Amino acid sequence: MLTDLEKNAIRDHYQNIGKNLPGFRPRASQREMIAAIANAFSRTLTREEGEEAPKREGESIAVIEGPTGVGKSLAYLLAGGIMAQTRGKRLIVSSATVALQEQLVDRDLPFLVEKSGLELTFALAKGRGRYLCPYKLYQLTQNNAQQNVLGLEAPEVLWDSKPKPEELNLLRDIADEFSARRFNGDRDAWPEKIDDAIWLKVTNDRHGCLKSACPNRAECPFYLARDVLETVDVVVANHDLLLADISMGGGVILPAPENSFYCIDEAHHLPKKALSRFAAEHSWNIAVWTLEKLPQLTGKIAALTDKAELANLADEAATSLLDSLHEWQFHLAEEPSLSLGSSENDRRKHNEPTWLWEDGKIPEGLETTVSNTAIAARSLLKHVIGLNDALSAARREKEQDGALLDRLTSEFGLFIARIEQISAVWDLLSTVPIEGEEPLAKWITRHADDKNDYIFNASPISSASHLANSLWRRAAGAVLTSATLQSLGSFNLILRQTGLLWLPETTTLALESPFNFDTQGELYIPPVHASPKDPDAHTAAIVEWLPKLVSPVEAIGTLVLFSSRKQMQDVALRLPDEYLPLLLVQGELPKAVLLQRHHQAIAEGKASIIFGLDSFAEGLDLPGTACVQVIIAKLPFAMPDNPIEKTQNRWIEQRGGNPFIEITVPEASIKLIQAVGRLIRTEQDYGRVTILDNRVKTQRYGQQLLACLPPFKRIG
């Protein structure tokens, strides 16, 4: 229950914004969101001393759909910040995109502090991989870096291939700038793009980290940043970092869930982000390289730690795993679904050959092979972790070999990370779910451009149970928000995907839009007779209709959204000549350049037409005359073309369900709402949405999809 102190603090600081910002208008929807968040967080269950952790069923969790214009970030920062301070928690704000993270840290939080008078401290959290490791950097850039503790040339271990002069020069430049404190060690702060292969050599990773024993601990960018996170009220992160922390048990990178209130913005991205986090994959080639090189490392570790027996066990496990992987070569070579096309053209036409294990079941006759591979990987991981612990102990005890042990620990970290990845894959591949449980998706792909390499993959088909048990049931409180969370007028899809459907006390709230859609916009569905199921005829129809809908001389912006890159390109090529100079096609220019040219054309009194795909249907902000018309070529149905979706669809069908109705249509509803949402961005905007897909009229689900769109005036 909210205390009077909390109520007064929220009211007073919100009123301060109006006093300090001329023209600020309190919005009813924003106030409603503030109240909903504060009330949810006030219901947090606390753990009394000597008692077990409280059983949380969603009483302090709210799912809030806040349309564009509500002012969501101000609402959750104000309510969440105050509630975190009064309840002794930390506020963790997580977003899906870098753009929103930067907006929160650079604009929204400073604005709130300045205008409301609320004293909030905040910091941006990033994963280890965004920071360099000074120890690795200095080792690679010292004059003797071509020789290392293993007695091997650096290219053999520190580099996968001989470093180029420009690569070494770049690392020396980075080292010079870092040591002079002109570069803070954050990859995003380096003025030029650093190639992934180069950054991997100097990045901070948990296995290679020397922690408190590191001679460069005092200048380590990662630890300096983490120290700051321990002192602030608000931590701004992204979904990937949040999920990484949860997968490690929580409280490793970010504050512990039990001590945190979460604001999950752009929450509709969370389920698929979580799936990626809980999945695993490894390359056959990289695994073999790792296992072949490993004995050179274990021998050196044994000599420095007196752990010869443990090193021998690791070598035996590595040999066993290597034998298993070589055995897999025979099985993979005989699998028809992994055969490559007979010509280079065939390879380019098709995706990489994939062997999907139907229903996640291990193929007949391979049960023992899968089990043996998993056992060998698990055993190897156990032994290399033991060797790593021995290295850490030796580093604390031995002074004379300190530098050698440091170098070896850092290099060994790469191998542990890869072995951990291999073991995770085979743990999933060997898992047999209990009868009635969701299957795991399991598949193997073959590189079309490298016929000798295969990728082993495994993934849950849903992240719901992981999120429910690892996050929601542990968190002190959470709010999930986005402009689009409902599908077909219901929160069921997002609740099911996130696992919140299992927490019955979770509250949901759909806020009213501040826009007058019936006067600001129109919805037009022209009589397009060609069905999208006939791609050629439908493309011809779009080419016919666009000149009727878009003037080549009126100085307004038009956004045309396609579901197919091929159709987008075909239409662009077949439009009348006078339209070609007006076109800005996604993929032909960097996004920032494309948008800059679009705004410039409008400012110069010219028409401008953007052709875009699904990614332009979300997050693109084109207010005013920059977007007066949105044309949707086809309903955004996603085809179940990846192994996870195929496995999920089969499981639904086996349970008597219909994946098209249960998944495809609801997800299309969300995408369609997002696409339509590109039109009206402010209370002054106006325009028209046109849908060139006759299925909204001819199919029953079409009316369901239309019913969920803003109440524009219908024409035609």
Predicted regions and their residues:
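A contiguous, basic/glycine-rich beta-loop/short-helix subdomain that forms a polymer-engagement track
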Residues: 199-235, 243-253, 387-529, 538-539, ...
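Walker A/P-loop
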Residues: 47-78
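Conserved interdomain hinge at the start of the Helicase C-terminal
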Residues: 469, 526-563
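Walker A/P-loop NTP-binding motif
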Residues: 38-42, 73-87, 107-111
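A substrate-engagement module of RecA-like helicase motors
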Residues: 2-18, 25, 49-57, 87-90, ...
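Conserved helicase motor "Helicase C" RecA-like lobe of SF1/SF2 P-loop NTPases
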Residues: 563-587
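Conserved RecA-like P-loop NTPase helicase motor core
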Residues: 526-537, 588-697
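Signature of the SF2 helicase/ATPase Hel1-core->accessory helical subdomain module
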Residues: 76, 82, 99-102, 107-110, ...
